[in-house]
């Protein structure tokens, strides 16, 4: 009896936070991962722990040329991709009393443009993959505006729109698209968040739950609905 080959997945933002937790879960399940992050050391540590399962493709995903080269390296090593998980991104909080447009430029470049570069590099590989699946992360702040998240909300709304439009465009090509909205997860990116977080997920639990839901390939995976009462009164 032939064995089902392990899925080949490109995971961005794998050096820390949700990305690192997703990588841990996926590698433990036997998947083969192409891991991207700016910091190489965490990726090397995973490669040492899971020999033969990790393809190291670090780089600056805001640099379109570097992303093209990453795509070429994955193609040379594997020939195709079964999944792309777009997790890389940043979260910046802005005080409206000192609004700084350079912050939204940074957020858009790091989150929206980098995701677009990765999609461009991966689509030829996904078309050649086995039941291909594109997973993009867009924050729940697109549904629930919070203080100091104007820039994050605008960028993540763009991400969500891009992913949902791609779902329509890529369906005839056999590529499924899922938008993942994790909500509050216990990562360093929420340390500056000074609003109540009534349903703050532990990192490992969030990663396991996300992957369980993603396997079903729904259009959207949103963590448990927020208890709105926990947000009032808002801080002054």
Q: What positions do the PLM features span?
A:
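Residue(s) in the substrate-gating loop at a strand-loop-helix junction
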Residues: 139
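Substrate-binding pocket helix/loop in short-chain dehydrogenase/reductase
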Residues: 95-108
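Active-site helix of classical SDR
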Residues: 119, 155-156
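Conserved glycine-rich Rossmann-like NAD(P)H-binding loop of the short-chain dehydrogenase/reductase
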Residues: 31-45
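Conserved glycine-rich cofactor-binding loop
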Residues: 13-16
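C-terminal helical subdomain
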Residues: 179-180, 195-232
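Conserved NAD(P)H cofactor-binding loop of Rossmann-fold oxidoreductase domains
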Residues: 87-93
